Amino acid sequence: MGATPRSNCRVVDKFRLPPISRFTAILLAISIGLAAIGMGGWWWLQRSSPLHFQAEQLHEPAAARFLPRNANLSFYLQLDPNQLPAYGRAVARSKQRNSAANALTQLRNGLFATAGLNYNNELSNWIGPELAIALTASSNNQIQPSWVLALSSRTANGAREFLQTFWQTRSLAGGDLSISSYRGLGLISSSNPEAPLATALINDQLVLITSSRDALEDALDSSQVDALNQSSDPQLQNWLKQNRKGVALLRSDATGISQLLGLPAKLVAEEQMQQLVGSIAVQGSELQLAAQISTGIDRNDPPLGDRANQWLQQLRHSADQINISNANSSLNSLLTVAVTKPGPLLNELQRQNQGPLLLALINSNQWLAATDVANPSPEALNQPLHLAGFDPTSINSMDVWSRLSGQTNRAGELKAILAGASASKANVRWWSNNFDELQNQLQTKGVNKKAPFIDAKSVAFSQLGPKLSRDLLGHWSFWQGLQLLAAQPLSPAVNGLEYMLEEDKTSLDLKATLHFS
């Protein structure tokens, strides 16, 4: 037999890359290394810059497990308190950077001081980017609310070392301490009747400080039952599932809204406010609040739609206040306009209007309004205004209602008292109690590119200028408290406020923006 031919076992790899030189390999390694360093450096700069606050994604707070669900007001902060002054300096105008940083420093330090804590000496070197506080109001208004404060640690031993120093300092000051165990945790409390504080350490990473030992035991009891703590609160969970961005979470019930946040009890009762959950975000020098308020009212106001934005874009004036809402809206208690003397035209316009109405307050005595072009028609106002003593006439395609005063001007002509005037332009009917203001509006060309944008689903909108915003905040007890903590007035920095409302069955969705200069 002939010899069997040997098989060719050599495999030829058609896709083998050509060999690279050592120099090329070194260059490639250096390039990859530099790219990695660059990406890491970019990430580090983004995280270390206070401006990263603007892009933060909210997440479920670890402290939620230890905050009782029956607390009337809860606030979660998810940012590094040490960076607050730097953020204020970064977004403020050049001449106001120091004052902005100082205001945030004082406000931060003042907030911790209310709990008996010195931020610079006791907290700044270890406190982490998560903290929370829950407040429970007393049935006796003369008694301060009980509270639970939760502080995260950014270092391995910072929380434990803080507690040692915290109680050592207070023990040396003459306070008697009680050390015990509760639910497997070591509890330390003070017998000082003026400051009966209590503390516990959770896994070396979370410090609980409470206004009393009872409040601490209540918090620890709640942590063992999902139905009693906020970690499993469906309203809070549903809010977080919507991928909200921000630096803070807010949760409150009706008592917290009226007694602790300081909204008028009459307003809370009229709107039947029951629960509030929301988040706070920062964008430049703006503070943005998004919230959902559960109420006991079945709401069915129609959305404003695109016409609200069209009206705002056509509006020429820089008004002290602008409101847009539907006729007979259930939200009118939230949208009052401070017209000193509304006059018969505005009163009748508001009575007869059946659709949305834009009302701009030019100053305390002058107003400008917009409605759909034929709702109501000027003719529908003739009879009631005639009964009020004002007769209709037409001047340059404008409907005017006026009456003679019986007084004469320098030329000997009788003076006229104006109730107001109206004219249409671009499918919008404009109204005003000032003839010149209406003429100026009709002569406006183009659109206002700085006009705020309203979501199409919104049922109401309000915008306040600097003065009215400061006046409104100045009468709010919660704002007054913040100014006391900051040890300086905060209102002068306020540059405006706007908010819009949407409805969903028995709840209100609120979006508000507070502008700072």
What does each of the following model-derived ranges do?
Residues 75, 121-236, 352-456:
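Single conserved position on a long alpha-helix in the C-terminal lobe of the eukaryotic protein kinase
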Residues 14-46, 54-63, 202-203, 211, ...:
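Leucine-rich, highly hydrophobic segment in Treponema pallidum outer-membrane-associated proteins
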Residues 93-97, 110-117, 129, 169, ...:
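Surface-exposed polar/charged interaction patches
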Residues 99-102, 114, 231, 340, ...:
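Alpha-helix boundary/N-cap detector
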Residues 83-84, 257-258, 408-412, 467-470:
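A short acidic, often aromatic-flanked loop/helix-cap motif at beta-alpha or helix-coil junctions
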Residues 18-25, 35-174, 184, 262-267, ...:
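Structural boundary/hinge residues at secondary-structure and domain interfaces
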Residues 1-12:
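N-terminal intrinsically disordered, acidic low-complexity segments at the extreme N-terminus
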Residues 273-277, 347, 409-417:
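Aromatic/basic-lined ligand-recognition segments
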